[in-house]
Amino acid sequence: MSNSDLELSNAASPPPVELDNSQVDEIINNVRCVAIPWQGYQRSGSLEENELQEIENLTGKPLSAYVKTAEEDTTAYSNLFLKLLSMKDTPDVVNFALVKLADTLLNSNKFLSAFGPAFYDFLEKDESYINYLDDDSKLLFARVFALCSSSSPCSVAKAFTLFLEYLGKLMQSLNPLTRLFAVQCLNGVLTLKAHRYALWAENTCSFRLAELLRNSIGDTQLQYYSLFCFWQLTFESHIAQDINKRFDLIKLLVQIIRSDTKTKVYRLVLAILVNLIDKAPKDTISTMLLEHVDKAVQLLQKRKWADEDITNYLDFITSTLDESSKHLSTFDMYKSELDTGILHWSPSHRSEDFWHQNAKRLNEDNYALLKKLFHIVQYNEDNTSLAVACHDLGAYIRSYPEGRSLIIKYGAKQRIMDLMSHPDPEVRFEALSTVQLLMTEVCFLSKITL
């Protein structure tokens, strides 16, 4: 099975631009109830007579009627909406425009295609537009921005970055509906390749998305939309190669598989795994074996699934991992674990035979793997990773005594000594054990000198 056969509908998704959210719906309903003195704006010169007529064509009529009206003259009504959006000092007018505009965009692909480029031209002249709006207006603006960006790539880099930063802030909200809305908006814009790479380069928003997914157990909708964002990201090979290193995503997917969740969530998790195998096999398959994805998937295979796609995903993942396990050596697995930057107590770490056979291999390619251990010890904040890295450096010099000088040369000795006072007892123990091995050599050399 090739992942190129997968379509958007195959992940059991609603149209990503629907953005159904009761919090935002309440704001929209309130906006619809506001009476705006349009004739007063026309008399004051804020609106032209023809613009007043166009506004009247949008008010007091069924949705289908005013959408049809806007479709008949996309240029005129695009200009009208942008004119109303430019009236930032009149929030009621801006909100009216944002609500009517979203209605039209949601129900007319023709208008969506025509309005997007004009909207970006508008933002080109006012890149920080979102910053001038009040909280409710920002939510409505984000809705319109997501709709436009689901259809055509945003050509205003700063405006898109500000949009992502805004979504990142919403993801930190204490209100679960606000967090959900942020992920729904992000889900909409990620339908386009350019926006996937823009999100990946921006960093902050994607990290908050990952944090939301980690904490989404029990919130099926948030979990689902968060996973859908990751699924779209993994269609890009460059992103798929790095996504597990950045977020430890495979481990998280295994946790979700082992939880009791909805079929649509399992479906997305499996689709992400298929993408990772298809787009970045060298970077992900060995990690999947380390995280026991094969065993987790086997648990799902014991269930009866009415969904044929799920059974196909399960069969593909199982057969691929089974075949790969026959060809990957223990050292290949260890190397892949180091590549992730996140270490676990897998069997190779405590195996004396493994270190006797492979310690010198850490020196290959200008000490590439050894330097990765140094980097983990120096910068990683995960307690288990720190403990395992300290242990591995001790095992390395136990099997390759000459390695002591390398640990000192690259500055890792002082860091390991510092870790002897780490708050985690396992980290302290492994750091102490490795320091003892380092100091044993120092004492031995001192005696020789004397």
Curated annotation (Swiss-Prot):
GO terms for cellular component: fungal-type vacuole membrane; vacuolar proton-transporting V-type ATPase, V1 domain. InterPro entries: ARM-like, ARM-type_fold, ATPase_V1-cplx_hsu, ATPase_V1-cplx_hsu_C, ATPase_V1-cplx_hsu_C_sf. GO terms for molecular function: ATP hydrolysis activity; proton-transporting ATPase activity, rotational mechanism. One of its GO terms (biological process) is proton transmembrane transport. Its main location: membrane. Gene3D superfamilies: Leucine-rich Repeat Variant (1.25.10.10), V-type ATPase, subunit H, C-terminal domain (1.25.40.150). It is found in: Vacuole membrane. It is a peripheral membrane protein. Keywords: Hydrogen ion transport, Ion transport, Membrane, Transport, Vacuole. Subunit of the V1 complex of vacuolar(H+)-ATPase (V-ATPase), a multisubunit enzyme composed of a peripheral complex (V1) that hydrolyzes ATP and a membrane integral complex (V0) that translocates protons. V-ATPase is responsible for acidifying and maintaining the pH of intracellular compartments. This subunit is essential for activity, but not assembly, of the enzyme complex. This subunit is also required for silencing the ATPase activity of V-ATPase when V1 is detached from V0. Belongs to the V-ATPase H subunit family. V-ATPase is a heteromultimeric enzyme composed of a peripheral catalytic V1 complex (components A to H) attached to an integral membrane V0 proton pore complex (components: a, c, c', c'', d, e, f and VOA1). This is V-type proton ATPase subunit H. It comes from Schizosaccharomyces pombe (strain 972 / ATCC 24843) (Fission yeast). The gene is vma13.
